Amino acid sequence: MVNQKIQLICETESAVQFTALCQQKGLIHDPNSYLALVQTKVEGQVRLELRKLDEPKLGAVYVDFVTGTMAHRRKFGGGRAEAVAKAVGIKGNYLPTVIDATAGLGRDAFVLAALGCKVRLVERHPVVHLLLQDGLKRAYADAEIGTMMQANMQLLDIAHIQELNSSEEGADVVYLDPMYPHKQKSALVKKEMRIFQHLIGADLDADMLLEPALLLAQKRAVVKRPDYADFLAKKTPHFSHQTKNHRFDIYLKT
């Protein structure tokens, strides 16, 4: 069970709603925590942020599908040539349904959704779940991508894919990208990873995700790994797609 104690800070006038949201996810305010979930307002929009208070230079982690990096990736990224698109098997008119069982900040899921895949997301850590839920809420209301997002990206109110019924709630593809201990030299590359390591740590029970993923997947399970990582659950995939720093291991449904 992850530690759900975190400093809870409200910088808006919606303290009652923020408190209720945190209580719903079982978050406990810890005034001594260096990690803080913050409700703030930026350019007139209320959003949730994760901050590491003892390292303010890291900035905040939040989910934004409308502007910034994700908007640029949607408009000018590789599209169907993106590694994740190839890994899930997008080809011609075939757009698989996908369950992203370790959704995180929803970035890979967003790439697939923007290409037309129907993606259901599962995120078990309550703080990350709230960040993702908040980002989706703002995206659903956006004039440009709102309709697409509502149709193609759905965050499920469950903590683990084992809660899904494989016969009724499966998908063509189940996608896994569990947290993995970073090499020391790469630990500072991304602020999100540094803050996430403090919040979540490594996914020590990640191996237990593969079996339920294979049960839910109707065609394949895809596991994203750092290029130096072992196969998940020590299970050899049918084949892999290699990128500069990562590897997509593909397990076909037999």
Swiss-Prot record:
Which spans are transmembrane here? none
Entry's localization field = Cytoplasm
| Reaction equation(s) it catalyzes | guanosine(1516) in 16S rRNA + S-adenosyl-L-methionine = N(2)-methylguanosine(1516) in 16S rRNA + S-adenosyl-L-homocysteine + H(+)
Xref: Gene3D superfamilies: Vaccinia Virus protein VP39 (3.40.50.150), YhiQ-like domain (3.40.1630.10)
Supply the Pfam families for this chain: SAM_MT
Q: Which domain of life is it from?
A: Bacteria
The enzyme's main class, written as a single word, is: transferase
GO function term, MF aspect, one: rRNA (guanine-N2-)-methyltransferase activity
Q: Which residues bind S-adenosyl-L-methionine?
A: 107-108, 123-124, 177
Enzyme nomenclature, EC number: 2.1.1.242
Q: Which GO terms describe its cellular component?
A: cytoplasm
Q: Does the keyword Transport apply?
A: no
Write the record's keywords in alphabetical order, separated by commas. Cytoplasm, Methyltransferase, rRNA processing, S-adenosyl-L-methionine, Transferase
Q: Give the function comment from the record.
A: Specifically methylates the guanosine in position 1516 of 16S rRNA.
HAMAP family per the record?
16SrRNA_methyltr_J (MF_01523)
Q: Which family does it belong to?
A: Belongs to the methyltransferase superfamily. RsmJ family.
User: What is this protein's name?
Assistant: Ribosomal RNA small subunit methyltransferase J
Q: Which gene holds the coding sequence for this protein?
A: rsmJ
